[in-house]
Amino acid sequence: MPLNLPFSSPLKLPLPRRFIILILSASILILFLHTFAPSTLPPVLTPNLPHHEPDASYFSPSKWLPPILNPNAPTRPLEFDEDGQCLFLSPFDALSAAEKARARVLSLDEISPGIVRADAPPAEGTDADPDFDDEFSELSNATRKMPAGLTHPILGLLRDGEAKWNSMVTMQSQTLEQAVDVYMDRWGRRPPKGFDEWWHFAKANNVLLPDEYDPIMNSLLPFYALPIDTLKERLVEAEKIPETFTLIVHDGKVELKWNDDYSRDTWWASRPRADSQINLMEPFIKHIGTFRATFTIHDQPSILLDHERQEELLTAARHGKISTHPNELDRAEQNWRKACPPDSPLNKGEEELEAPDSFISSHLAAMDICQHPSYMENHGMLLEEKNSDSHPKPHTKLYPILVPSKTALNGDIPVTPIGKDGRRDDIGHDPEWNRKSGKLYWRGLATGLQHNKKAGAKWRQSHRERLHFLANDKSDTYTEVLSPVGSSGEAELARMPLRELGQYYMDVKLAGGNWQCDWGDGTCEEMEKEIDFAPKDSSERSNDFKYVFDTDGNAWSSRFPRLMASNNVVIKSTVFPEWNTNSLPEWYAYVPSKMDYSDLFSIMTFFRGTPSGRGAHDEVARRIALNGQCWVERTWRREDLQAYMFRLYLEYARLTSPDRDNGKMDYVSTQKKASKEADDVPAAADIETPVIDQ
């Protein structure tokens, strides 16, 4: 019996109406699936949803294969716990199965401190392999032909970055007693008086990494080799250094003393920085004792001892000895070679070549100027000569000066960022990840050095100018780029036009016109002719990009916490370790880049994929961006800045106290515990302090 429908069969409708009904039905189905089951649709039909290869060509299978049928499409993990606390995600888990398998057996070869490349596969790393360069191991940092089947080194860096972070978090002290034990194991002495009050403050404010304060003691250690009377003299002399201010803490109160009229009346940043440091003290000032701390008003460090003297002081301090020989002529110079060991690559004149297939594994080690001689020719602060007319004036004598940034060689004492009480700036409107551009973004002023024909004559080699020239190259130059081979885990070197790379991967420019330049000698005019300056952008502009670059200015980059707080992957290049660099996990919460930028296009190729749409790792990048946000939320709060400064002031109060060496400024919990610990670690009061002549 035929079925009688209350309406005409679509098959009996005119052909145009059939197409209309078909299109409407398909649209309704797509809309339904888009709302309730988006993973069943190919990414090309869901452009507003995240995709692990968003920049792939429309002819790429990944654009047409629904995620539910695509084994390479990673799942989306939870980003917050039930209390709204951000969760750290696993970038490594977002790799394909083939990439994970390769990464687990990958060996990374360190070619210089903090810099690695993938080790050649054993089966192919032989003389029988025509693609293997057996002279590679004898070269310092040179480019070579890639062995066939080589694993991409970034896979191993993702593996190691995650393991480093997980291990660090797991190993943190949970009790005051554990924290004391960790301190004594690291430094061979008891913590400072008031350590228990600091611990209670840290725990009450949920400080995530209470054991990671090594930069404090590393910077203070040389001062322990100075006799108390000598250190007292240095404190007085430090207050006479121009362009500084001193905080005088006594009986739970703080007094601000300006050490010159310029600092008080002229320099715009002086008052906000001093006030910010004072405001940070408020919750703990009653616990930090009595001391006088002198701060520079500048961003850059000023103390640079000769290597021999620095080692003498460190050796004496580590052995609990005192040096009475001053042996420190205060020369108004900044001689980096004298600050490095005689057998260092810098003093041996070793050449460090660009290498697109090597990457930073340990950023702290990679910042070592002595081990990376190329820095002397590609960073503004190292290119520029310093003398008695410089600001700040350089010193080769160990003065206790607190500073917002320093290199690993400088003798200054690092403090936390000090703008707006050290708080992160408001990041503004931050679009969803999939609505951001896949290019790398950077805008900045032409800072880094004074541009002139004298001390700043090499300004074209400075770090900011080089970045601009690299991204906006208009020549026919080719460069090598290490590219992923799909999602196989393999890598290949390819020569590509620098101009095309810049156009595809970069939105990077110097902005605001010439800056810090000499009009009298014609340098400003040269800058205007050679640099296509962009207009200044708002700080929110960087939020429109998945990848943002951060590099040094005259010193450290104050924009770093704001960039990390937004939903971007921060790619950072610097020679300045900061107060919390030890706790910043590479390739997990951010991506480090070498100072010569030779790895920059290789990094972008790994994450965004090749211009033809191959090998993108968008979900890996998204998770790194979220980890960066979470890292800032968990470790760069106002309370974290206070915890650091609280601990620094406790250490500083002991260091500068007349009772430094008699044990009265050490922490002991109870008389019973003090007696027990005295059997293992003698207090300074129980031993005669040896004196050595150095």
From Swiss-Prot:
Annotated coiled-coil segments of the chain: none
Keywords carried by this UniProt record: Glycoprotein, Glycosyltransferase, Membrane, Signal-anchor, Transferase, Transmembrane, Transmembrane helix, Virulence
Extracellular side: 40-694
EC number, UniProt record: 2.4.1.-
Membrane topology summary: Single-pass type II membrane protein
Disordered: annotated segments: 661-694
Keyword flag ATP-binding: no
Glycosylation sites: N141
Intrachain S-S bonds: none
Chief subcellular location: membrane
Gene Ontology terms: cellular component: membrane
Phenotype of gene-disrupted mutants: Attenuation of cryptococcal growth in a mouse model of infection due to defects in capsule polysaccharide content. The general morphology of the capsule is normal but two main capsule polysaccharides, glucuronoxylomannan (GXM) and galactoxylomannan (GalXM), lack beta-1,2-xylose residues.
Location in or out of the cell: Membrane
Biological processes, Gene Ontology terms: capsule polysaccharide biosynthetic process; glycosphingolipid biosynthetic process
Keyword Transmembrane helix: yes
EC class (word): transferase
Function noted in UniProt: Beta-1,2-xylosyltransferase that plays a key role in capsule polysaccharide synthesis by transferring xylose to alpha-1,3-dimannoside in a beta-1,2-linkage. Also mediates glycosylation of glycosphingolipids; constitutes the unique xylosyltransferase responsible for adding xylose to glycosphingolipids.
Family, per entry: Belongs to the glycosyltransferase 90 family.
Name listed for the protein in its UniProt record: Beta-1,2-xylosyltransferase 1
Top-level taxonomy: Eukaryota, Fungi, Dikarya, Basidiomycota, Agaricomycotina
Gene name, Swiss-Prot/TrEMBL: CXT1
